[in-house]
């Protein structure tokens, strides 16, 4: 669904259904140095496959994060009022895979496009082998599952399917359902009622239009004070009180709360990094945001991009681009590319009237302690304001 970035909303407002590219008469683009390009691509593939998370992504996909983030105490639960969900195992990647092994036509590991070497996607089916959804991801499970206290993975998959069909973001709709539950519109954990509500989006009922407009709109309409959004976009499935670098990314990303902009997680390669410290979060967020903006500009998938953050794999990526374009590129190429993209995004936001006041998490993350850790988001404002200010 073209929902998370707002692309679907813009297209819908213009009654634009599709963009069709006709390559008739176009000359195929080929690498300038084919031999060096093949060599660099081979090295790049090895670097991606050597990533420690690689086997888990291939065998389980992003839902492998459910139990991991739940164990960190940062799994959004009951509209971000808790950091752990008692029903986490019932919606975990491991449980999902066991179900899929028993179901006809299910594919626990699936390439979302030809040539992918990560294969982190999947095809999730029902007991009869009918496809419910393909690309059943961690973020959907977190926002539509634990965040709404729903522990029925099939119900979550069906909600995912409906969101795909009507072209809305599962994270923002999950956030909208949770704030609606907080307002008393439906009961916590009532999966059937939640699925029925999501189906109303396509029917354009009053409730459906409200939910379809997302988390912030729904919360404001219902008078809910605890609305988990930045710049109008719902937070992802990582509570920023426990993963404070992610909170900095949520705050400062030009797009709003966006984990893909720079997901700052504990890294075995950097044991000194403390995700719960109030200081030292701006630097990691800035580094990742710059790298990911560069990789986005190159059209790289995030799952392939994350293993390329270290200097050696990153130099291999730069060699790959250099061999393709025929242009000499230095070690700062990716950082410069990312910085250029972030500057352009920031310039747009400045022109649209956004200020530093918009680079903030909702107050409740700063004031309410997150069980079970008792953490609050307490990164100093001056550290937040140092990010993406070029």
Regions found by a protein language model. Give the residues of each.
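Extended C-terminal regions of large enzymes
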Residues: 1-7, 11-390
């Amino acid at each position: 669904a073209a929902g998370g970035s707002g692309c679907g909303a813009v297209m819908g407002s213009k009654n634009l259904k599709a963009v069709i590219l006709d390559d008739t008469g176009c000359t195929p683009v080929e690498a300038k140095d084919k031999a060096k390009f093949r060599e660099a691509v081979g090295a790049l593939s090895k670097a991606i496959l050597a990533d420690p998370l690689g086997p888990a992504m291939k065998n389980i996909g992003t839902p492998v994060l459910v139990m991991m983030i739940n164990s960190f105490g940062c799994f959004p639960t009951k509209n971000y009022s808790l950091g752990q969900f008692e029903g986490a195992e019932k919606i975990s990647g491991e449980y999902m895979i066991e179900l899929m092994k028993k179901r006809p036509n299910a594919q626990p590991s699936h390439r979302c496009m030809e040539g992918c070497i990560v294969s982190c996607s999947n095809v999730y089916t029902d007991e009869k082998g009918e496809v419910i959804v393909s690309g059943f991801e961690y973020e959907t499970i977190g926002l539509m599952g634990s965040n709404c206290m729903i522990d029925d993975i099939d119900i979550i998959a069906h909600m995912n399917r409906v969101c795909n069909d009507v072209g809305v973001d599962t994270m923002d709709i999950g956030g909208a359902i949770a704030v609606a539950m907080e307002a008393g519109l439906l009961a916590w954990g009532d999966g059937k009622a939640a699925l029925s509500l999501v189906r109303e989006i396509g029917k354009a009922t009053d409730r459906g239009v409200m939910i379809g407009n997302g988390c912030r709109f729904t919360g404001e309409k219902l008078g809910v004070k605890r609305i988990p959004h930045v710049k109008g976009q719902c937070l992802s499935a990582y509570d920023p009180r426990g993963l404070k670098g992610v909170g900095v990314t949520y705050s400062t990303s030009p797009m709003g709360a966006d984990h893909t902009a720079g997901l700052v997680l504990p890294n075995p390669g950097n044991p000194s990094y403390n995700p719960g410290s109030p200081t030292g979060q701006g630097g990691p967020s800035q580094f990742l945001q710059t790298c990911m903006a560069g990789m986005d500009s190159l059209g790289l998938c995030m799952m392939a991009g994350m293993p390329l953050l270290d200097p050696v794999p990153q130099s291999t990526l730069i060699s790959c681009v250099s061999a393709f374009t025929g242009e000499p590129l230095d070690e700062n190429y990716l950082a410069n590319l990312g910085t250029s993209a972030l500057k352009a995004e920031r310039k747009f936001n400045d022109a649209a009237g956004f200020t530093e006041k918009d680079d903030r998490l909702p107050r409740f993350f700063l004031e309410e302690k997150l069980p079970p850790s008792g953490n609050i988001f307490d990164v100093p404002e001056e550290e937040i304001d140092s990010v993406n200010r070029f």
